[in-house]
Amino acid sequence: MDLTCFDLQQSMEFALKYLIEMNGERYVTTHDLNAQLNKIDKMNIHDPVLEKVRLKSYVYNSWETESRYKDSFMPLAADVEEAISVCKELILFVESNTNQKAELNKLTAF
């Protein structure tokens, strides 16, 4: 379960950073999901899934270190199941948002 939680946090973090970079900005150099979400807010990108990540970011952020270094780490199964769903939804949103940008870039390249 430890590795699952770590991988979920990392997947969300990398998806947010990818979204930022693919929209022409530099991501914040931290593992904090809220820092990336704040940057995305400033970029005027909004979606309900981003709010889902924000609502549980205190849980997901803790997984980045606690899952690897805290022997007593024991996540709630409901949190893990919800995180899997949110992570999938986030990745789909990021793919959709960045694919639209890529298509727009192709159209304006000429």
How would you describe each model-predicted region?
Residues 1-110:
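Terminal alpha-helical segments
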